[in-house]
Amino acid sequence: MRPADSWKDYELLDATGGNRLERWGETILIRPDPQVVWKTEKQSPLWAKADAIYHRSNQGGGEWEYRRRLPEKWKISCGEGEDKLTLIVSPTGFKHTGVFPEQAVNWAWYARKIRAAGRPVKVLNLFGYTGGATLACAAAGATVCHVDASKGIVAWGKDNAAASGLADRPIRWLVDDCAKFVAREKRRGNTYDGIIMDPPSYGRGPGGEIWKLEDCIYELISQCEEVLSDTPLFFAVNSYTTGLSPAVMEYMLKTTLVPRFGGKTSCDEIGLPVSATGGVVPCGATAIWEE
């Protein structure tokens, strides 16, 4: 397990009974988490002082119950020094806040790899969401192409870049279907030194294209291999579904990339430390190929 344990503005205070108790800056939220299957006694007194609680609906989706008036959005910081990012938090109708805090452990890893490369690095970030990985790579000196199917989410990423003082960095923000974009990049002969993908379990592209992770991921990894440069630095695949284990993702990277590039592969769960118990809640997995 690789815990994202360097946060100051985010904290997983406690977790039990299918819910997380979280601090986002000064704001306390309760959100459901299907991984939290245990029903231990609540350890934190802040359960009773949450500012907002997300309630799932039996029909899908859900809604927020606000116990005090909150701003529509606010900012939190991640990292320090040259790697410091400022990210905009905003509770959405699907329980998300615009930040997956467990990914901070990967953001720091990408930044270290890019800084250590000692050469110009081009990164492709697929399913880039609100841009945490994109900004971490850009802050470390990379040129980044950020692709996501949601126009609103890409706009959120641009706002995060401005908040982080990175609006002038070489970042292309694209609203596109990721698989179609990679196919076009192959035809154009464009290549990248690093590829990051954070695919959803299920989704739709801007043209109604259907994405189902288990059915589509291997083909996309294979396509991405063809847009890697001759001297690639890394390739990272994230998954949030229990239907795709870390070892399966690593196997796909190993069989797709190692025959051509050599290098090594690894995989692990990523998670968030729980302040009340000292445990770590799993929040998905990452498989990595690196030179």
Give the ranges of each region predicted by the language model.
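Non-catalytic substrate-recognition/targeting regions of SAM-dependent transferases
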Residues: K8-E22, L29-P101, A108
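Conserved alpha-helix/loop element of class I SAM-dependent methyltransferases that forms part
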Residues: P101-R119
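Conserved class I S-adenosyl-L-methionine
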Residues: G118-Y129
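Short beta->alpha hinge that forms the Motif I/post-I loop of the SAM-binding pocket
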Residues: G128, D148-G152, C216
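Conserved SAM-binding loop of SAM-dependent methyltransferases across substrates and taxa
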Residues: T130-V144
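S-adenosyl-L-methionine
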Residues: S150-I196
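S-adenosylmethionine
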Residues: C178-V258
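C-terminal catalytic and target-recognition region of SAM-dependent MTase-like enzymes
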Residues: P232-E291
